[in-house]
């Protein structure tokens, strides 16, 4: 008879632990697979990623875009990190526009890929 309350207590403890895993990540770092805002876009690494993305795009498209700065962004934890960066860039005539660059980076393998680069309006 004492087994039933013990089993119920165990079941309740397991359920509470599972619920904490599902909803307990609020405010405790990025959720794996979910996008979270980059709080400090002025961070030198974020600015360097934005510059690299514009340079990579310009080398592939020959449109002459020049990096100005990262204005906002999000990050996504995957097997490495995806960065969705809103960058300000200017064309050869000096006109400035915003673009959305998605960069995949895996620091332990020195991997960096530009997976997307579009005008911000198309984002």
Curated annotation (Swiss-Prot):
- Pfam families to which the protein is assigned, alphabetical: SQAPI
Q: Which domain of life is it from?
A: Eukaryota
Q: Cite the InterPro entries for this sequence.
A: Cystatin (IPR027214), Cystatin_dom (IPR000010), Cystatin_sf (IPR046350), Prot_inh_cystat_CS (IPR018073)
Question: What CDD domains does the database record attribute to this sequence?
Answer: CY
Function summary: Specific inhibitor of cysteine proteinases. Probably involved in the regulation of endogenous processes and in defense against pests and pathogens.
The family annotation for this protein states: Belongs to the cystatin family. Phytocystatin subfamily.
Annotated protein name in UniProt: Cysteine proteinase inhibitor 8
Q: Which organism is it from?
A: Oryza sativa subsp. japonica
């Amino acid at each position: 008879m004492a087994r039933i309350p013990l089993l119920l207590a165990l079941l309740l403890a397991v359920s509470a632990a599972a619920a904490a895993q599902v909803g307990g990540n609020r405010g405790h770092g990025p959720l794996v697979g979910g996008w979270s805002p980059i709080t400090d876009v002025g961070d030198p690494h974020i600015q360097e990623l934005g510059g690299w993305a514009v340079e990579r795009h310009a080398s592939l498209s020959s449109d002459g875009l020049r990096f100005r700065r990262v204005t906002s962004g999000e990050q996504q934890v995957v097997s490495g990190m995806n960065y969705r960066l809103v960058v300000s860039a200017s064309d050869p005539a000096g006109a400035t526009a915003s673009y959305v660059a998605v960069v995949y980076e895996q620091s332990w393998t020195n991997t960096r890929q530009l997976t997307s680069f579009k005008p911000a309006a198309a984002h």
